[in-house]
Design a protein with these regions (language model features):
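Active-site-adjacent "subsite" loops/lids of carbohydrate-active enzymes
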Residues: 90-96, 102-109, 180-249
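The substrate-binding groove and active-site-proximal loops of carbohydrate-active enzymes
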Residues: 95-109, 145-161, 219-236, 265-278, ...
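Aromatic-lined carbohydrate-binding/catalytic grooves of carbohydrate-active enzymes
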Residues: 115-116, 120-162, 186-201, 205, ...
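Active-site neighborhood of glycoside hydrolase catalytic domains
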Residues: 230-316, 322-334
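C-terminal beta-strand-rich structural cap/linker in extracellular carbohydrate-active enzymes
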Residues: 533-555
Length: 555
């Protein structure tokens, strides 16, 4: 069921510098337990655990990740009982961790808090409100002076204003930004009644006879017809619609969606339209209309990302991943993240990468834990984040689809994985240069290769900083395929490899070596003994299940 015996929680998903952190525990463990606060592998302080709630004041440094853990000593050995990460960042765009919402029926405050507490425990700092709006061309139901209390969404579900605003308020209490979702260019069949002009649409022919549209059959209330973001009239119209939204709802920004490449398109006058080229103009217009609000735009399969969205005023880059090759799928993920880094001059990447996709489209079932964790290990090790958590975990592009459930083991693992990417954000997502690692196992327990992954081997990813190297080991020992999506849910759990004698090339005199893994010790780091011989060190990796991070610190 995913119940965690000793669960640590914090009152927020992220903190402003100088803000105190409130920590709490569901159960008080027996015996002498110590609370330990760390930044990376450096212990900042330790205090005895005396109760189920307390507060901590981190340093006022901005953009820092911390790990807090509870440990006890048994027979001279340290045993970690629980941990939680803390992100101190004045702006979530520095380390975005996206979640979503997809249902807005009548909900009590208690029900809303249950969903948001779960996102909060995963340190989600941006929440995108999928399918919340009334109509694509008129997102607000009613008017700013008389907003509707209940409206029908695109599939005729009831949406409650009290639920949408309740979620926004709950997010703000937890340090999360709320982004409302909408297409850049969508209009429903009744748009003329709401002031959308015929000349604003995109057409499949030069004589404005056939509008381009996204077909949606019953129970959806309308197809979605495409408008032309190149037109200032449409941009002004949408900016006004969004102003109406902001007057009623305390949203923090707009998550802009698109539908990928649409083939040949023409405007009303028969001129050819390069759809991707319209995105920067649209984003810029939305930013000018509301300079204080955050913007993000989905690049479907990277459509419109390079030189266009990537250079626009968006908080971070967001890619919906559709390429899923069976034999080198994981390099699709790393290529997207490294391209985005380069194209945007270092903005972070969030991937909408839907797991166990075929399984999710077939009906009720469970996510395949190894598939999900292998995808997350790869995305996180390359410095990305994975949009996957909401009221349920995502399996398809229709966000309300909750056909697949998470097993208890996956629920538990997700908590630690999110602690890991938050606690070690300064290594995973904060500078450094990727490099090719030279590493091998001297005891024959593993075969090591540089990224990309090879079945039955361990893949390494290196990141070099001024005075440290970070080396990720990702385990593909039993992989039956290398498709990140694990579409049919057939991926096999890797073998646990313990105390592996490892040889790694280094660039200078080594001061300390430490390791951390989301699969062991609740992600808490441990220092390791090592021997240096010239430009090599020998070190025993304590364990490798899915992903272990080795950190080499230099003098």
């Amino acid at each position: 069921d995913g119940y965690i015996t000793v669960l640590l929680s914090t009152d927020k998903a992220a903190y402003q510098p100088g803000e105190p952190v409130q920590l709490s525990l569901n159960n008080l463990p027996e015996g002498q337990v110590t609370i330990r606060y760390k930044h990376l592998n450096k212990v900042l302080s330790e205090t005895p655990l005396t109760g189920k709630s307390w507060s901590w004041n981190p340093s006022t440094d901005d953009f820092k990740g911390y790990m807090v853990d509870l440990y006890t000593v048994e027979n001279g050995e340290e045993v970690v009982l629980s941990s939680i990460a803390i992100d101190v960042s004045s702006d979530p765009a520095r380390f975005p961790r996206n979640g979503f919402l997809s249902e807005y029926g009548k909900m009590s405050e208690k029900e809303i808090n249950k969903v948001m507490d779960n996102l909060n425990r995963h340190h989600i700092n941006y929440v995108q409100y999928q399918d919340w709006h009334y109509k694509h061309h008129k997102p607000l139901a009613g008017s700013p002076s008389a907003p509707m209390d209940v409206w029908k969404d695109i599939i005729n579900r009831d949406c409650y204003r009290s639920t949408v605003q309740g979620y926004i308020d709950a997010g703000h209490k937890r340090g999360m930004k709320s982004l409302f979702y909408n297409l850049a260019y969508g209009a429903l069949s009744d748009a003329a009644d709401d002031g959308v002009k015929e000349a604003w649409y995109l057409f499949k022919d030069k004589k404005h006879g056939n509008k381009d549209y996204h077909p949606l059959g019953s129970p959806f209330k309308s197809n979605i017809y495409l408008t032309n973001p190149a037109l200032q009239e449409w941009r002004d119209y949408m900016a006004q619609q969004n102003n109406d939204v902001y007057e009623v709802f305390d949203f923090d920004g707009y998550q802009i969606d698109q539908l990928g490449g649409r083939g040949e398109l023409y405007d009303y006058n028969g001129n050819s339209v390069d759809l991707a080229a319209t995105f920067p103009v649209f984003i810029k217009a939305m930013k000018e209309a509301q300079p204080k609000k955050s913007l993000v735009m989905n690049a479907v399969g990277q459509y419109g990302q390079e030189n266009l969205i990537a250079n626009s005023p968006v908080d971070f880059l967001y890619t919906e991943v559709w390429e899923k090759p069976t034999d080198n799928g994981f390099s699709v993920l790393s290529n997207i993240i490294t391209n985005n880094d380069r194209w945007s001059n270092g903005k972070k990447t969030v991937l909408a990468a839907y797991m166990n996709y075929k399984l999710g489209g077939e009906g009720r079932g469970y996510f395949n834990t190894p598939g999900v964790l292998m995808a997350n290990a790869a995305i996180h090790a390359w410095g990305g984040a994975h949009l996957e958590l909401g009221e349920h975990m995502l399996t398809t592009e229709y966000f309300p689809n909750s056909s697949l459930a998470m097993k208890g083991e996956l629920k538990k693992a997700m908590v630690t994985y999110y602690d890991f990417i938050t606690g070690y954000e300064n290594l995973l997502r904060d500078g450094g240069e990727f490099y090719g690692v030279t590493a091998s196992s001297t005891d024959g327990k593993m075969t090591v290769n540089q990224w990309p992954p090879v079945r039955n081997q361990i893949a390494t990813i290196g990141k070099r900083f001024d005075r440290r190297d970070v080396i990720h080991f990702l385990n593909y020992t039993n992989a039956v395929h290398l498709d990140w999506c694990d579409s049919n849910g057939t991926q096999v759990e890797p073998s646990l490899i313990e105390s592996v004698q490892t040889k790694v090339s280094v660039k200078g005199t080594v001061r300390t070596v430490w390791a951390a893994s989301p699969d062991a010790r609740f992600g808490v780091s441990q220092e390791l003994d090592f021997v240096q011989e010239g430009n090599e060190i020998k070190v025993a990796l304590p364990s490798l299940k899915y992903w272990t991070m080795l950190v080499v610190e230099y003098e």
